[in-house]
Regions:
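Short, small-residue-biased leader/transition segments that mark boundaries at the very start
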Residues: 1-13
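Cytoplasmic helix-loop-helix junction between adjacent transmembrane helices
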Residues: 17-54
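C-terminal transmembrane helical hairpin of 12-TM major facilitator-type secondary transporters
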Residues: 186-248
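Helix-to-loop junctions at the C-terminal end of transmembrane segments
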Residues: 173-184, 286-287
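C-terminal membrane-cytosol helix-exit motif in multi-pass small-molecule transporters
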Residues: 82-103, 306-314
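Helix-loop-helix hairpin linking two adjacent transmembrane segments in secondary transporters
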Residues: 50-96
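Juxtamembrane intracellular "pre-TM" segments in multi-pass secondary transporters
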Residues: 99-126
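Extracytoplasmic gate region of multi-pass secondary transporters
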Residues: 120-171, 245
Length: 331
């Protein structure tokens, strides 16, 4: 068909443009060490938390993009976003600075920076971030259809309730940075994982009906979360993961002050891969089990791994409460 031939270049250019936008997202990993190095060690968690709170744009997008689409058509959406990005570029150009002291010395090779990746702690931080960021991204994508399928809600109501998870998960990252500076990355991450474990345990339980034989005959009981309890638990989980995203990067600034760029990049990559792979696994699990809450069962198991790993490598050697808990045990 000649129409398909004419549309091929358009599709190809659209794909290339999409890849370019995705590559631009890598600037987040560049910005993390850039921001951190302007602040003393005891304020780096707060600085990176405020910077990382920009992730809340993903939640705001759920409200803004549909409004623009309905009012002006889909072509206006990328135009508006392009204008915002251009404005941000101008502001950055006018008000940002460069300090040569923040640069890696020329005698330090790129391969030397990557040697830190052999450190088992880096793998552990990748695992933590694959939960608090990768899980956040994955569930943000999954929640709307979960509400529609599990509770029969209208898609507009479902999107609004899903924002109760995704919006705090971005905005409150700054508070997580403040807490990490005050109490230490380890203490904040430890409690984040326990709160996640409790929430995911409750969220994992599927809607269940069971019958008990009593002296008066069969008694059927129902166990399951209603939409209000479910949304409340998701909100708590979103807040916990917001704090966790900040505390993981506080670990990095504490343990690798001279190599924040390379380490934060690989940890960020782990989070991005989690956000990509987990929705696929959610769908596969639901197809295999027929249980929608199997997504939370998977996340529950992953959090178990984090808690066990953290206990054997950190908790046994440090306090998580009290005056001696303020510093990372690995710093």
């Amino acid at each position: 068909d000649h129409r398909d031939l004419h549309s091929f270049p358009t599709r190809r250019s659209s794909d290339l443009t999409s890849h370019a936008v995705g590559l631009a997202g890598g600037s987040f990993s560049v910005g993390t060490p850039y921001v951190a190095r302007w602040f003393p060690k005891n304020r780096q968690g707060t600085a990176m938390g405020i910077y990382g709170a920009g992730n809340s744009g993903a939640a705001v997008n759920k409200f803004v993009a549909p409004v623009i689409l309905v009012a002006f058509g889909w072509t206006m959406v990328p135009q508006v976003y392009a204008a915002i990005m251009l404005g941000t570029l101008v502001l950055f150009w006018l008000f940002s600075y460069s300090d040569p002291a923040h640069l890696v010395p020329s005698n330090v090779k790129f391969t030397d920076q990557l040697k830190a990746l052999k450190d088992p702690k880096v793998l552990k931080y990748c695992q933590y971030y694959s939960i608090v960021f990768g899980g956040y991204v994955a569930l943000s994508l999954w929640m709307v259809q979960y509400y529609v399928g599990e509770y029969g809600l209208d898609i507009r109501v479902a999107a609004l309730l899903a924002a109760c998870f995704s919006l705090p998960g971005g905005v409150l990252r700054a508070i997580g940075g403040v807490l990490s500076d005050k109490y230490g990355a380890h203490s904040v991450t430890w409690w984040v994982m326990w709160v996640s474990w409790i929430c995911l345990f409750l969220l994992s339980y599927p809607q269940t009906d069971f019958t008990i034989q009593t002296v008066n005959g069969p008694l059927t009981l129902h166990i399951g979360l209603n939409v209000y309890l479910f949304t409340a638990l998701m909100g708590i989980l979103g807040v916990a993961w917001a704090f966790g995203k900040a505390s993981v990067f506080k670990y990095i600034s504490d343990d690798y002050p001279k190599n924040i760029g390379a380490i934060s990049g690989i940890v960020g990559l782990a989070g991005g891969l989690g956000g990509f792979i987990l929705p696929i696994m959610f769908g596969a699990l639901m197809d295999w089990t027929g249980i929608r809450s199997s997504a939370f069962m998977l996340m529950y198991g992953v959090v178990w791994v984090s808690l066990i790993w953290m206990y054997w490598t950190e908790v046994r050697r440090t306090e998580v409460m009290g005056s001696n808990a303020a510093a990372s045990p690995l710093a």
